[in-house]
A protein has these predicted regions:
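N-terminal glycine/serine-rich phosphate-binding loop of ATP-dependent small-molecule kinases
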Residues: 1-112
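Glycine-rich phosphate-binding/catalytic subdomain of phosphoryl-transfer
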Residues: 73-161
């Protein structure tokens, strides 16, 4: 379906759009779409992982400020293209890197620094899980990170909610 500019503006102003946000390895991306999936605006923020204590990670502050910058970039795109402001959405979806390790307690506190998909410190766990399931479990998968934390007797494991 082809949308003219006025119809897109109406959808934005009426809160009939959907926002998708993705925390990728190198960029945080935001895309505003119409109900049929047609993209109408986008924003992004470039970020860089950090190697700290031999763990690839992102700081929580990087996540928050990166999301804010990405959203601001999206809003600028909407203003530039449609002279409109985003004030209401019909739906919102957030995704993140498909592999990594984020462990939270019952109060939603991050227990250890975010371990990204780039970490390959889970060989023992990946082998045990692969043999147990009869299915290849790569070192980068979240389950391998969790089980390696168990095998390493990491102090945070018993507080995971």
């Amino acid at each position: 379906m082809h949308y003219n500019k006025e119809l897109i503006i109406k959808n934005i102003n009426d809160g009939e759009t959907f926002l998708g946000i993705e925390f990728g390895s190198t960029r945080i991306k935001a895309v505003l779409i119409l109900e049929d999936g047609t993209p109408v605006a986008q924003g992004s923020h470039i970020w860089e992982k950090r190697l700290e204590h031999n763990i690839w990670t992102y700081h929580m502050d990087d996540i928050i400020t990166g999301l804010q910058d990405c959203y601001q970039s999206l809003c600028k795109d909407i203003l530039d293209k449609y002279d409109s402001q985003l004030t209401c959405l019909k739906g919102l979806g957030i995704s993140a890197m498909m592999h990594g390790y984020l462990a939270f307690d019952k109060d939603n506190n991050l227990l250890v620094p975010f371990r990204t998909w780039r970490n390959t410190t889970t060989g023992e766990a990946a082998n045990v899980l692969t043999n147990a399931f009869g299915f290849n479990i790569p070192e980068r998968w979240s389950i391998a990170h969790l089980y390696q934390a168990v095998l390493n007797n990491e102090e945070h494991v018993n507080r995971i909610a």
